[in-house]
């Protein structure tokens, strides 16, 4: 009887019947937490249009992906679609939301560890004006939560919105770095 119990536990841990082993199950639970946090920001940045969710149903082959694929619920169409169908700007917003959600979850799970700094490299050039406004409002709100957000970008419109900048300029003799602070 003891061997049967141990054998049964082993099969559950390996995911023999469900196709999802214990590791993927735990990762899925963590991804759900990250997705919930990311949704708050993605909803703001997309004007309420998008929500992230784990893919379900026939689109998922749990043995290959472990049920860790994401879909996007589009409130305009009322349908879910695979994340790969998002435009470049929409993909940037979803990625930014996931990064921010991950930072939130790590902070919660780490018991007192604070992730006070984040650097974002590009992506803003793919956003239309309205979406850029929403993304910037989200990032500025994060500054009010004692977080430093560094944006690495060549988008000139951001220069007008960011009051403290570290400008890097290439010259023939090397790069020059200078802080600029608007009054």
Predicted regions and their residues:
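Terminal ABC-like ATPase head and other globular end-domains that cap long coiled-coil arms
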Residues: 1-183
